[in-house]
Amino acid sequence: MGLLQEKLAKYDLPQKFMAQGVYPYFREIEGKQGTEVEMGGHEVLMFGSNAYTGLTGDERVIEAGIKAMHKYGSGCAGSRFLNGTLDLHVQLEKELAAFVGKDEALCFSTGFTVNSGVIPALTDRNDYIICDDRDHASIVDGRRLSFSQQLKYKHNDMADLEKQLQKCNPDSVKLIIVDGVFSMEGDLANLPEIVRLKHKYNATIMVDEAHGLGVFGKQGRGVWDHFGLTHEVDLIMGTFSKSLASIGGFIAADSSIINWLRHNARTYIFSASNTPAATASALEALHIIQNEPERLEALWEATNYALKRFREAGFEIGATESPIIPLYVRDTEKTFMVTKLAFDEGVFINPVIPPACAPQDTLVRVALMATHTKDQIDRAVEKLVKAFKALDIL
């Protein structure tokens, strides 16, 4: 056994939970992801999906992808920088830019590669990056790849953000990067106050709208629109893998920023471009959410009903203001156990443990879709109450 294998062989935490029968990852789904999914020959209530708009199984989205494959083929066989740009990519970028009120947008192969490529491309040794300490892992990795000076502020603590800004050279670039919706806890960034501090300290703001797009604001434009900050956020990032029912991501900003990123973001230049099917499906989903406001209304009706039911049942759900509802467990082993008990009762939820959260903040994450019914929510709450009580969590 080589040194690398010897080192990695010591990692046996997954095997420990497998032996206990509570390992919760890589569960196989045998069909489309809707509010109920086929798993192991059984129907399971799906409350672990990020498909907030409920469009992953929509026939219009599927058909758009099929038509694109027939026209363009299965892949582009190159990066956007070389032979991998389709007119379809350009159309999606133009429509995304218009949707979020920016000059231009760039599409990346995944949401993760947006953040991990854009952040180091924008900053150098003389610049500062300031992040919320609960920002997504892709933001964390993006700043790790940057040569900039890096600061973190306590979660949604605006006094601490100001303290970090005061440490910066006033004549240097200061890039504040924040999740619009925090993906595990479901709470929102305090964008109005961040914007105030932006102006006070001459900073730049980048907002990750992965969980805000399709959910907040007019037609689901995002948290920035929810707060009425149309021209105050400098860079808007989003993904296609959630509300847009596909795979990929984008960054939108003014033309000078996009021109720089188009020629300097390494994950854009050196990655194969989005597949025709993924691009066309995202474009069709974007059209649907703009043309069907009732879908956003249904999402919030389901969300508000679920929030009410979970609160009434006595769950600790924190400060969530979104379709992401954390049910706090505060114990890693019990988090896995309650996930297994819920699954055995026919409810799919996701466990959240370190490093996705602090050790004392472990939880199971419930996520709502526009297509969830009150009956499905009631059944899920009933089963989760049973699972939590069995472990003396509730």
Model features per residue range: what roles?
Residues 6-74, 203:
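N-terminal "arm"/small-domain region of PLP-dependent enzymes with the aminotransferase-like
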Residues 59, 63-67, 71, 98, ...:
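PLP-dependent enzyme catalytic core of the Aspartate aminotransferase-like
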Residues 79-83, 93-117:
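Short loop-beta-helix segment that forms the pyridoxal 5′-phosphate
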Residues 118-137:
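Conserved PLP-anchoring active-site segment centered on the Schiff-base-forming lysine
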Residues 151, 155-207:
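Active-site phosphate-binding strand-loop segment of PLP-dependent enzymes
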Residues 202, 209, 222-240, 259-263:
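Conserved active-site segment immediately N-terminal to the catalytic lysine
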Residues 235-237, 244-293:
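Conserved core segment of the aminotransferase class I/II
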Residues 297-304, 311-346, 356, 360-361, ...:
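Conserved PLP-binding catalytic core of the aspartate aminotransferase-like
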